[in-house]
Amino acid sequence: MGLRVFFFGLGYSAGALIRRTPAIEPSGTARLDERVAQLRAAGVEAYTFDGTRADPGLEAALQRAEAIVVSIPPRGGQGPLDRYAEAIAAAQNLSRIVYFSTVGVYGEHGGGWVDETAATLTRSERGLARLADEARWTEAGRTRGIAVDILRLPGIYGPGRNALDKLRRGEARRIVKPNHVVNRAHVDDIAEAARLVLSRGLPGQIWNVADDEPAPPQDVIAYAAGLLGVPAPPEEPFDTSALSPMAASFFAEEKRVSNAKAKALLGFTPAFPSYREGLSALYEAGEGRSV
């Protein structure tokens, strides 16, 4: 019998973890009824939870869990702890909670390397909400003696979500801001880190999960264009790029995220140590080929 894992958010990263770990017996939530129907058709015990309503069977499924993985971001309405704190407390076999957070909580570090001991200097509304959620889940685990792991994640790419597909759709831009780099990780590497956390039995703690090479975003687009044999979009200076507020926010802070702790203590080794290996593998799998 496999590990019973309840996922708050059966989305992109959770799906990769489930595919990578056949021993998991998954159940969990999705926001839309249509997505829940798809998951159930695929044999996954899925329930609707969108912060305002939930399926009646969700609470019973949650109480059977041996581990909980939380990948939904803080948003308006009731979050999992607002609605299900009592059910989580009543889960007799629950031994671990894994919360997917963001490296955005570190905020501005002048382009320097940050590890898990670095100050969390975020001033953005999203980052502060994430920090508050980290604290709430950590406290929920502490009061029950349950290990809580915080996985701080960078930009996620993988099948269907990558620079190759952006080029195919005509959406790729090469925005250049001097000395700016982006931290990223392939979704399969995130899934592997989460699998290790669930299986190693270490005390709950914070983990940075990222590849080995933070890189300028314009270089990533250029590499993808080279794989596809198409011209790279022209470079655009950040100062005159007319980005949306959301897109511009990703250029607001400078840091390089270290994965050294996960390598040393979890035995985490990225299968895709940089965007080059990740994009090359995606290209070989057929991503973006209709350009």
Language-model region placement:
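A conserved pocket-lining segment of Rossmann-fold NAD(P)-dependent short-chain dehydrogenase/reductase
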Residues: 165-185, 189
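Catalytic helix-loop patch of NAD(P)-dependent Rossmann-fold dehydrogenases
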Residues: 110-150
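NAD(P)-cofactor binding segment of oxidoreductase domains
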Residues: 58-99
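Mid/C-terminal beta-alpha module of Rossmann-like enzyme folds, strongest
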Residues: 193-194, 200-247
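Amphipathic terminal alpha-helices
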Residues: 273-291
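Conserved C-terminal active-site "lid" loop/helix of NAD(P)H-dependent oxidoreductases
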Residues: 222, 241-269
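Glycine/proline-rich active-site loop of Rossmann-fold NAD(P)-dependent oxidoreductases
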Residues: 131, 144-146, 156-169, 196-207, ...
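Conserved Rossmann-fold NAD(P)-dependent oxidoreductase catalytic core, especially the SDR/UDP-sugar
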Residues: 85-125
